[in-house]
Amino acid sequence: MVQQIDAPLREDVRLLGNLLGETLKQHAGQELFNQIEQIRALAKGARDGQAEAEKQLEQLFLELPDEELLPLTRAFSHFLNFANIAEQYHVVRSRRQAEFDPDANSPNPLVHLFKKFKDKNISTEKLFQQICDLKIELVLTAHPTEVSRRTLIQKYDDINACLSQLDQQKLTPRERQNALANLKQQISSAWQTDEIRQHRPTPVDEAKWGFATIEQTLWNAVPKFIRELNELVQDNCQQNLPLHIAPVRFASWMGGDRDGNPNVTHQITQEVLWLSRWQAADLYLRDIENLRWELSIQSCSEEMVEAIGSPHPEPYREYLRATRERLKATRHWLAQRLQGLEADDSNVIKSKDELLQPLLLCYRSLIDSNLPEIANGQLLDFIYRVNCFGIELLKLDIRQESGRHRQAISAITEYLGLGNFESWTEQARQNFLIQELQSKRPLLPKYINEPEGSLIGHPDVQEVFATMRTLADQPPESLGAYIISMAEYPSDVLAVLLLQKEAGIQHPLRVVPLFETLKDLDGAATTMNTLFNMHWYKQHIQGKHEVMIGYSDSAKDAGFMSANWAQYRAQEELTAIARKHGVQLTLFHGRGGSISRGGAPTQQALFSQPPGSISGAIRVTEQGEMIRFKFGLEGIAMQNLEIYTAATLEATLLPPPEPKAEWRELMNRMTDHSVKVYRQTVRENPHFVKYLRTVTPELELQMLPLGSRPAKRKVSGGIESLRAIPWVFAWTQIRLMLPAWLGTGAAINEVIADQQKATLDEMLQQWPYFQTLIDMLEMVLSKADANIALYYESHLTEDEDLKVLGNQLRQRLKDAVETLLTLKDESKLLSDNEVLDQSMQVRKPYLLPLHLLQAELMKRRRDYLAERQAEHTPVDHALMVSIAGIAAGLRNT
């Protein structure tokens, strides 16, 4: 039987389901509604183990005409999205309810952490200083797994607001009736809206979604979060946080990530940079209008009078008039540039300090005038926002693949008659690059580097030069890091520095190598040691460096366990090398939502990093759909800001213990075995690629307009050419979840069979890293379903070789589950995580029909294509809806 979920959540799920049912009856007819209810009843029976119910369900879908598949698919997809809405709102409701109950545990992890610090005798001075020094940066990326349209997301937010209104205790009957009517209207509107985009979003569209997240939730959540943090600091450290505090900041890859995305050009990057500054100016302009309205008071300091030039009846309004006009001028100038027009920039705000200084003067004046309650109102929120978001709203990272930079340098060396840079030894490359970086003369004549100078190189190379020229024209504060994907050698870093020098970038972007494959992770520390040993480079970095750890590609390359351990070791080695050279290292974690892309609950994920690797500073990507789940609602955004802050503080001040030598030895042994098993299947089995493309919707995923990036790095090729994210997504759709467990279960089982379980038990009890690894494995295994995977296979192929492989994979999945249960001494998965277990049980009756429908839709579509028929719109549309619905139902897998 299904365990009972919290009553308020259950009521919300039921309410949304009932209103969806009423909407279906009204707009799609009683017959469809009856059919959906029949399917739901059969799916519940199948969930509870009734084999006959599942057979009836399968037969029903086989007999349905094409045109009836779409409304059925949409109905079940909508319900899963509504379940997500109800769960997200329940998190916000639970936080609020806890504040009413003095005996309840605080939902803020910082409250518990401060108590822990006190128990562990962390001094208040040390704690205060560490909070002031925090540097957490969350980097928003638009990876193609956010399948929901922005239009629908807005409607989901409106539904959430309706649930909040209905939760109010003192609604009159009429108010409640109106709230229900509004909720039904939103659900009806969602049903009447196409959930699938007609066109792929452009990189500019993606960037605008990032700006919308800031405007709709984080703009208010950030100052509220800092206020709460300050209250805790006052209570525990008896001090106030400084005005310049910004423990969490935000950056973006949207419009800057050109790795494998030909749609991100230098023109697009320039447009996004201008748009970002325009959005910031627009938001600040609204704030300053509100602030001037509030600051009608007369009392002010001598400093304020001097700044105005003479006494004034409304000094603050008068003083802020100039800042308001500058914000208007800034917004106007950016609007003109976005339209391709020139404009006067003499009054444009070009740095954060230009905006901040007038606000700080107002703050000092109010404090001097004995008006702290006004100083600490809207004005303080404004100051917090400027410190967090700057004049750029989101700093833009630039990312490009290392090979492009090598090609660009090669084009230069060949033009100069020096030969092909790419064919040189690594030492020769380093010598040349360092020599040119130290030289005061340019490497090329100036006209070669002009926009019209297309004298050297392939168009791809010219685009690298054009991007560098674009970066040279930006205010330094608008830009973040320059990420080199697929970084392998020290010369990869030096090449980007030389290209920046040649473009005349006065304030070079910090260059961040991204180590992604197993081989590159293993060599990361050696690469950085070589760089730190270079006198010129050591002077250039001025004691600070950032390195990015890739999760997605390493897991696709070696499997989850081997990649995870390689990432851990790389971080340990990088931390040690940086310490040896006196360099302050910031690790940038390229995590996603799925566990094979580094996904894990934030607090667990950060606390399980190697001791010393998080020293008050961290960067983390927030990818695709996770942005909405973590920051789509103000209350949830607040919670995630608290979690990131608590996790970073704890990992810094109370780092986990060093793993014992025997634990390391066992991990090395397990990962060696794991990668062999993984690669034997993925690389060496001749039928594997065909199985992936036949049984999963990998090919169909390419037709879904998910993101601006192509699903493949190259048009042709096998697994190695497939991007890591569609690779994970395809296996998730059929519930095999293969990237997350293949090889891992076999490796653990081998160790248990060798009488090593006692050591594993010790690791599970005492080592946060291993605890997190096993917890994540259990979570993903709980969402896997071998029977559903078998249904796809039996429905989509008659190939005996593929069936043999499928049997092997499902047996490995079964073995992995049994191994995990043995390791944890449990009889069922998620015994210690009832919340997730209940959530999945509620979703099963809606997920099962979507899977069966999807398999049938894939078969019909392929049959039509085999018969050379044109695209079959009802089938294509329904298939895309099924992909979106399953993604919504499974969320972070």
Residue positions per predicted region:
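Glycine- and acidic
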Residues: 1-5, 58, 196-215, 266, ...
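Hydrophobic alpha-helical packing residues
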Residues: 20, 225, 229, 366, ...
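Short, flexible loop/turn elements at secondary-structure junctions
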Residues: 80, 252-258, 393, 400, ...
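Often metal-dependent polyanion-binding catalytic scaffolds in large enzymes
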Residues: 1-434, 460, 509, 599, ...
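Acidic, glycine-enriched catalytic cores built around paired aspartates
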Residues: 2-5, 14-17, 23-25, 54-78, ...
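Catalytic or ion-translocation cores adjacent to nucleophile or general acid/base/metal-coordination motifs
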Residues: 264-293, 501-676
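Structured alpha-helical segments in the cores of large, soluble enzyme domains
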Residues: 136, 141, 146-149, 153, ...
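Core mixed alpha/beta domains of very large multi-subunit molecular machines
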Residues: 195, 199, 408, 416-538, ...
